[in-house]
Amino acid sequence: MERSLSMELVRVTEAAALASARWMGRGKKDEADEAATSAMRDVFDTVPMKGTVVIGEGEMDEAPMLYIGEKLGNGYGPRVDVAVDPLEGTNILASGGWNALTVIAVADHGTLLNAPDMYMQKIAVGPEAVGCIDIEAPVIDNLKAVAKAKNKDVEDVVATILNRERHAKIISELREAGARIKLINDGDVAGAINTAFDHTGVDILFGSGGAPEGVLSAVALKALGGEIIGKLLPQSEEEITRCHKMGLDLSKVLRMEDLVKGDDAIFAATGVTDGELLKGVQFKGSVGTTESLVIRAKSGTVRFVDGRHSLKKKPNLVIRP
């Protein structure tokens, strides 16, 4: 893929962030998601690529746009798989919380796992602890391994996990081990990425969340030199049947190369609300400001991009709830 595609994808996540940010704290997650999705779809039409959505807003009969199988781009350029989450953390934005993002991952055609929309058990770490974690090992063993890799005591390790009833046992084990815990209400893509940046204070991600988000996280962590390991967790016979039809082995531990093959991949995200990693959208008069992250796996280059947007010249993004 052309390296210039990186900045084209930032334009897409910026548009989705600007369009949805007006809904912050207004309690209307569906409207916010619709705004992000529509803006993202519009800008995709200008991107020089021949893209196919492999992870999106649902099947063709479930979503009006950015559905699985939809063609994206202007029809020129590389043939790529596209994974999108137009608004990672709809509940976060609706309540005015932290870490809402707009997210895209693009990779060579046929290299992204077409993850079904179901739960995935996950464990993720940054570069210092790659090769140390085991998704089937006890919590305490993983904590000790990460502590050793990062030259810390277990009591100094910070684990992040979605604050869900299904995670009560893991949270109890983390507390019993003496680790520090950062509970997150939504948005485990941000939680996974945070493990790769020292200033976020996060060392390891535990727990289950969406499988599509696991693939998005894998692209980011591959580019950052980190690691995520997953295992599909179907919750019904229907989901089990769907996995079998897709040829997915439910007993298989999914490692980085299973989630995203090779290193010709790009990850882009823009903050919608403030978070540990990215500042959220700010508005002042006719100007909107954004902070984005774009990472290219092939080169390992990480860029933080500050954007200042004249909303007078982007009337389609001026949304008044």
Curated annotation (Swiss-Prot):
Source organism superkingdom: Bacteria
Gene that produces this protein: glpX
Cellular compartment(s): Cytoplasm
Annotated Gene3D superfamilies: 3.40.190.90, Fructose-1,6-Bisphosphatase, subunit A, domain 1
Entry protein name: Fructose-1,6-bisphosphatase class 2
EC number: 3.1.3.11
Cytoplasm keyword on record: yes
PANTHER family hit by this protein: FRUCTOSE-1,6-BISPHOSPHATASE 1 CLASS 2-RELATED, FRUCTOSE-1,6-BISPHOSPHATASE CLASS 2
Residues annotated for Mn(2+) 1 binding in this entry: 33, 57
Keywords of this entry: Carbohydrate metabolism, Cytoplasm, Hydrolase, Manganese, Metal-binding
Record-linked Pfam families: FBPase_glpX (PF03320)
GO biological process, one term: glycerol metabolic process
